[in-house]
Amino acid sequence: MPEAPTATVADEQELRERLRGCSTTRWLADGRVARIEGGLSNRAWRLDANGERWFVRLGHPQAARLGVDRESECAVLRAAAAAGLAPAVHACEPACGLLVTRFIDGRTWTATDAQRPGNLRRAAERLRRLHELPVPAGIHAVDYEHQARRLAATLPEGDATATLLAGQAAVAFARIGDGGRATVLCHNDLHHLNLLDDGDRLWLVDWEYGGRGNPLFDVASFLALHDLGPAATAVFLDAYGRLPAADRSRLEDACWLFDYVQWLWYRSRFPEPVGDEAWFAQRLAQRLLRCNN
């Protein structure tokens, strides 16, 4: 995890106040901190205290509006950590806006890393392990169709692109259906920036969109986020080994729908996007419109 330039004094002061205000994190408040770059919605730090190193996140104050259930995230993260898929959790305190986990001294994957056959197999095996875990009580359901409707409702009326894509999405969701699939623990944001490699183990981080859901969309998230071609997709699916033939035939729909929900998220999160956000939202829209659903 690379460190960003010096964080603002106000940010660091807020972090320390939050840490002092929560009984499980009070002892960390005087630790040495370094801001970690990245993240569209949250702020994060590396924190050294009492000879130990931690990752600390201050969550976005309007997480619920973004479709994030912090209580459920805590349960998902603890289950994943117990299985060795995610860093061990020291404190998950939604009321304080804090998440504290062990700091993983590893390298964040690049887009190129996510295309290499050996790494595709490693990522697929991690995802398979996640989908094999029992689903703990209290995990919220991640329903992509519901999320799409909720996000679409936040867009301005009269948006021709949004109207066209909503019609295509309805057809794609109907084709996928539920297929009698059992719901499993899902990450739902398998971007290479959420994969940390310590040289031995591949760790999945950033679980705020995790939940109980359709495994097809979790597979689609990795394929869509990395724009995998047929050969790379075959490597990933063979290593994953849990996707029935009927679901393989629906992967194109699932990838399109994942991109659609991403586009809606960006449009609702950044009503007037600029810079990287504007470029990415436009790129997603162009990709969605090129596909005939």
Region roles according to the model:
Residues 23, 84, 127, 131-135, ...:
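A general structural signal marking secondary-structure boundaries and capping sites
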Residues 8-27, 31, 132-188, 198, ...:
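An alpha-helical support segment within catalytic cores of ATP-dependent transferases
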Residues 34-56, 89, 171-217:
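Active-site acidic catalytic loop and adjacent metal/ATP-binding pocket
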Residues 3, 7, 154, 160-163, ...:
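ATP/Mg2+ or Mg2+-diphosphate-binding catalytic cores
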